[in-house]
Amino acid sequence: MSDKTFEELGLTTWLVANCKQLGFKAPSNIQANTIPEILKGRDIIASAKTGSGKTASFAIPILNQLSEDPYGVFAVILTPTRELAVQIGEQFNAIGAPMNVNCSVVIGGIDNVTQALILDKRPHIIVATPGRLASHLNNGLKIALKFCKFLVLDEADRLLGEDFELEIASILEHLPPPEKRQTLLFSATMTKNLTKLDSIALNKPFIFEDNSKYDTVDTLKQEYIYMPAPTKDCYLVYILKKHEGSSAIVFVNNCYAVEAVKGMLNKLDIPSVSLHSFLDQKSRLAALKTFKSGKVKVLVATDVASRGLDIPDVQIVINYKLSNSSKDYIHRVGRTARFGRSGRAISFITPHDVSLIKGIEEIIKKQLELYKTDDDEVFRHLKEASTARKIVEIHLDEIEFGVKQKERRTERNELQKQLKEVNNKEKFENNNNDNNNNNKTKTTKPENKKEITKIQEQPSKSTTTTKSIEKKPTTIESKKIDKDIKRKENNFDDGEISLFKKKKITNK
């Protein structure tokens, strides 16, 4: 905490009062440093460790400014995961309750039409994952973003990576230019991505970097167990039974392994829920709700659960499989020992993980302690854990778990690759045009625009086909002929037909 009070940050009276009512005793270090600068109208690049109050650092000043002149879409907040978007939306609603703030969460897994209707009402705050918001914009939904005052990238190091490059670029096209908006970048880790800001174009930003961002809190006990890889399951069962009743998150590296571990634990009477990207949104929210409520004490998850999620009572974090990134370790263990509470993080180390542990110890500037185990007790669970795991994996293979999701992900990656190639081609041609004639302004080649549109509108693989309609010259008569042909064939340019139009044609 800082020595300042919320009153000293220049906030309105109602906001200070509500912060106190919500239990914010004093601003955290990142809040005390960034809120005044945001109120001055400056762009921000800020990083601080997990649990430092980053969300409130941008939510409070945005609501402060919104209360002075409420209108349309005032702020767009982008975040990499659905769960984090929901959580940010909840914080905006809580802090902005006295002014009846209208905050909409726009994420995948929710009905598109329902979201479009909500966005059409111009909420004050839009909290979104890039893919879903870009999809709405690219599909022609007219969201009034031209007067948006704030663009926030939470977990900016992730959002500025290649995974979200095209979606972010698409969203930026619909926002005001950098000089007419404030851009705020927040992250738990400062990476090279945050220094490569050509696409965001910040205006002399205020940069705040918490010197302790890689430090883990003193109340967190960090330990390791060295083991052969095939014995991980029996060690996991041993630890969870030993700490029965404690709330624990088990981090695994892929969706299939998450389901396998969760299924194994449930078969061994250790109630567990899972969280990963292959689950639909309803299942993800249900799993989080069940875990947060304490009905189930074990959450098995991928790194979807490692960033930003505020689950105050997590007592143990288990790294069943270490991430290849040392900084991901910091995000994971940051799920426990929050807000002054104690916690412990236990990492499973195989002979292949020794170099990873050295990298982690170097970045956190402390050595992990050995977690003492009773090996006789551990190996009593070996047979039952192994048997349960095999049964679950056979079932997952029978239902072809994740096959369709992987296919869709492969298609999406291929589409992104094609779009990137088209964009690079466009940039190359524009650069050549500039070199040939410096007096000409940069223009986008029409054929490239058509090519991008064609790629974006490619239908997913389907067994149905549509009849092609021969293009006629663009005269009034030919347009009429085209229209009659389309009605007759019950077909339209994009190969699809709306229910409204279909009904209209049928009635004729």
UniProtKB/Swiss-Prot annotation:
Its EC number is 3.6.4.13. InterPro entries: DEAD/DEAH_box_helicase_dom (IPR011545), DEAD_box_RNA_helicase (IPR050079), Helicase_ATP-bd (IPR014001), Helicase_C-like (IPR001650), P-loop_NTPase (IPR027417), RNA-helicase_DEAD-box_CS (IPR000629), RNA_helicase_DEAD_Q_motif (IPR014014). It catalyses: ATP + H2O = ADP + phosphate + H(+). The keyword Hydrolase applies. A motif (Q motif) lies at residues 4-32. Residues 35-208 form the Helicase ATP-binding domain. Residues 430-441 have a biased composition (Low complexity). One of its GO terms (biological process) is rRNA processing. It comes from the Eukaryota. Residues 219-379 form the Helicase C-terminal domain. Keywords: ATP-binding, Helicase, Hydrolase, Nucleotide-binding. Residues 444-454 have a biased composition (Basic and acidic residues). ATP binds at A48, K49, T50, G51, S52, G53, K54, T55. Belongs to the DEAD box helicase family. DDX49/DBP8 subfamily. This is Probable ATP-dependent RNA helicase ddx49. The lineage of its organism: Eukaryota, Amoebozoa, Evosea, Eumycetozoa, Dictyostelia. The gene is ddx49.
